From Swiss-Prot:
Enzyme class, broadest EC rank: ligase
Subcellular location(s) of the protein: Cytoplasm
Keyword Mitochondrion assigned: no
Binding site for Zn(2+): 146, 149, 159, 162
UniProtKB keywords: Aminoacyl-tRNA synthetase, ATP-binding, Cytoplasm, Ligase, Metal-binding, Nucleotide-binding, Protein biosynthesis, RNA-binding, tRNA-binding, Zinc
Pfam families to which the protein is assigned, alphabetical: Anticodon_3, tRNA-synt_1g, tRNA_bind
Organism, as annotated: Glaesserella parasuis serovar 5 (strain SH0165) (Haemophilus parasuis)
Protein name in UniProt: Methionine--tRNA ligase
Aminoacyl-tRNA synthetase found in the keyword field: yes
One annotated GO biological process: methionyl-tRNA aminoacylation
tRNA-binding domain ranges (all copies): 582-684
Gene name of the encoded protein: metG
Length: 684
């Protein structure tokens, strides 16, 4: 008896309609698309929607700067985004915009329901106001001198030089980024969503398995620090939706953005006849999944489910978060040419190369993925060209030339074929649980076995012998049967290569017929299925990216030069002399950061879990001001004093000291080791 068909709705986080799609965005959309395509192959009813996040002050101001309307700006962005996603074969059923009538309707309805249920509060707040532009200023649209280190040209919420945080009203000599005028303080009534009212519901939901363990643990920290009322309103002028029954008040972009998931699906329903309530009503038995980046976990794990609960809609089945993309072990960089836009990549490289590389490294955890350019070329050529496609290319010619394109009527090696088919459920499980790296590893292991079979049988030798036609046909047909199975497994990852393979094999690649051989089946003449990836293609992408951002990099470099002058680091005097025997008492070791997190209720401490090769240790380090995203340190190698006596702290036992350079506070830099080191190595 077959399993009942599942009803699934999948979304990706909404790209902001004020910039281009880059390879960081593509990680999420490729991850989701592979999962969606796999579910389609399994016969499930699945719908895949997304939209542009099209509201907010940045869009309004950028449009004004360009001399166009916000509507014109977001329409251009939407067209560009759709083209980029299509270029990477992202198979959305609908791509919409939050600036739509559907989103206006649902945003207003949800707000009214929350208000009717007592979850909307109001209070008067003080804000900086631009008297020339006649507008209240968000924190990032105010600049001035840092009240702590006196660095100039700093934003209204934090200093990029000393990392201090503060109120925009604490800035020295504040000015409006919009007009250059000196802002004044004005009061305004704002509306707040009563998030604390949902704490017990959220605690139960976050512990129900609806979040990855890493997210659930992080949410627990937020509970411990206390949930706050959430300001959901902004004052005019603002590009967005007006709040019902209010004057010159607009919904904050983060209120209507997730509702955009519902609006995009409603737009799809209206076009196709799908039933919206089947997927969104409170008692819906459909599955709802959000694929997001780790930077927006707070909104999707707290505000969004609380909004849905308070307005009597269903909550997500699960929220799948992923890490960031690094390039060659470092953050994407405009100056190094690694902040690669999707459109730049598509000019030079087959999108399936990136789909495969991301899949080969993606798992179900919130880990950053390193896009190593040298490994990228090697892996694509080794796995896809040399192994997978080569399996077909060195057998198909014999079938076409010697047997008029017809495959054999029996399997030459039934046991080997059965072994390949038997892996279908394990590979399916890996795709289902988003452990794509394990699926790829399993598929490539089978590919190696298939190539070994051909190597051992050597059809090119058989072809030269008299009276061996039946054997030659059987061996080559067997190789192509194994190729068909492998391409079926890889179809969610490499959809365009799968299309070409289907045209060549003259059959549809389906999950439910993997175990059905193509006996006495006619195939088309073999044509090249995939081209080698060359280093010169990578170089072209890097150089074009550098040229694209040359002016902005130049301006940023000049700005950083000013900041360094404003906050000159004093060189401390050399400490008193010690002997070699004194130094020898220190046992310095290389340690790998397994986990790094902020210590709740501490302004300074980070908790490290360190791998020293043969054991792990916990170390607390007062470098929080210098590393505001502690999870980004995970996977790095650091230097520690391993024989320092353990110190009991209120948060736990600290078993060593991590070394860093700098004057303290935000001016601290972890010492790291050169490539090639391993955890536990002694520093000499």
């Amino acid at each position: 008896m077959s399993n009942p068909k599942r009803k699934i709705l999948v979304t990706c986080a909404l790209p902001y309609a004020n910039g281009a799609i880059h390879l960081g965005h593509m990680l999420e959309h490729i991850q989701a698309d592979i999962w969606v395509r796999f579910q389609r192959m399994r016969g499930n009813e699945i719908h895949f929607v997304c939209a542009d996040d099209a509201h907010g002050t940045p869009i309004m101001l950028n449009a004004d700067k360009l001399g166009i309307t916000p509507e014109q700006l977001i329409e251009k962005a939407k067209a560009d985004h759709i083209a980029d996603f299509a270029g990477f074969n992202i198979s959305f059923d609908n791509y919409h915009s939050t600036h739509s009538e559907e989103n206006r309707e649902y945003t207003s309805a949800i707000y009214k329901k929350l208000k009717a249920n007592g979850f909307i509060k109001s209070k008067v707040i003080s804000q900086l106001f631009d008297p020339e532009k006649n507008m209240f200023l968000p924190d990032r649209f105010v600049k001035g001198t840092c009240p702590k280190c006196k660095a100039e040209d700093q934003y209204g919420d934090n200093c990029e030089v000393c990392a201090s945080t503060y109120s925009p009203m604490d800035l020295i000599n504040p000015r409006s980024v919009v007009s250059g005028s000196t802002p004044v303080v004005k009061q305004s009534e704002h509306f707040f969503f009563d998030l604390p009212s949902f704490e017990e519901m959220l605690k139960a939901w976050t512990r129900s398995g609806s979040l990855q363990p890493e997210i659930a643990n992080k949410v627990q920290e937020w509970f411990e620090s206390g949930l706050q009322q959430w300001d959901i309103s902004r004052d005019a002028p603002y590009f967005g939706f007006e709040i019902p029954d209010s004057e010159n008040k607009f919904f904050y972009v983060w209120l209507d953005a997730p509702i955009g998931y519902m609006a995009s699906f409603k737009n799809l329903c209206d076009r196709t006849g799908l039933n919206f309530d089947d997927f969104w009503k409170k008692e819906s038995d459909a599955e709802l999944y959000h694929f997001i980046g780790k930077d927006i976990v707070y909104f999707h794990s707290l505000f969004w489910p609380a909004m849905l609960e308070g307005s009597e809609y269903r909550k997500p089945t699960n929220v799948f978060a992923h890490g960031y993309v690094t390039v060659d072990g470092q953050k994407m960089s405009k100056s190094r040419g690694t902040f690669i836009q999707a459109s730049t990549y598509l000019k030079h490289i087959d999108p399936e190369c990136l789909r495969y590389y991301y899949a080969a490294k993606l798992n179900d955890r919130i880990e950053d993925l390193d896009f190593n350019l040298e490994d990228f070329v090697q892996r694509v050529n080794s796995d896809i060209v040399n192994k997978l496609v080569n399996l077909a290319s060195r057998t198909a010619g014999f079938i076409t030339k010697r047997f008029e394109g017809k495959l054999a009527s029996t399997l030459e090696n039934q046991a080997l074929f059965d072994e390949f088919v038997a892996q279908s459920e394990q590979i399916a499980t890996y795709f289902e649980t988003r452990e794509y790296n394990k699926a790829i590893r399993e598929i490539m292991a089978l590919t190696d076995k298939a190539n070994k079979y051909i190597d051992d049988k050597a059809p090119w030798v058989i072809a030269k012998e008299e009276g061996t036609d039946a054997e030659l046909q059987a061996v080559c047909s067997m190789g192509l049967e194994l190729f068909r199975v492998l391409m079926s497994y890889l179809k969610p990852v490499l959809p365009k290569l799968a299309e070409r393979a289907e045209a060549f094999l003259q059959t549809e690649l389906r999950w439910d017929n993997i175990g059905s051989p193509l006996f006495a089946h006619s195939i088309a003449p073999f044509k090249s299925l995939f081209s080698r990836l060359e280093k010169k293609q990578i170089d072209a992408v890097i150089e074009e990216t550098k040229a694209l951002f040359a002016e902005s990099v130049k301006a940023e470099t000049a700005k950083k030069g000013k900041e360094m002058t404003a906050c000159e680091t004093k060189v401390e005097p050399i400490a008193p002399e010690i002997t070699i025997d004194d130094f020898a008492k220190l046992d310095l070791r290389v340690a790998k950061v397994l986990k790094c997190e902020a210590v709740p209720k501490s302004d300074k401490l980070l908790r490290f879990e360190l791998d020293l090769g043969d054991h792990t240790r916990q170390v607390f380090s007062g470098i929080k001001a210098a590393y505001s995203q502690p999870e980004e340190l995970e996977g790095r190698f650091v230097i520690m004093i391993a024989n320092l006596a353990p110190r009991k702290m209120s948060f736990g036992m600290s078993e060593g000291m991590i070394l860093s350079a700098g004057t303290g506070g935000a001016d601290l830099y972890l010492l790291s080791a050169d490539s090639g080191v391993t955890a536990g190595m002694q520093v000499r």
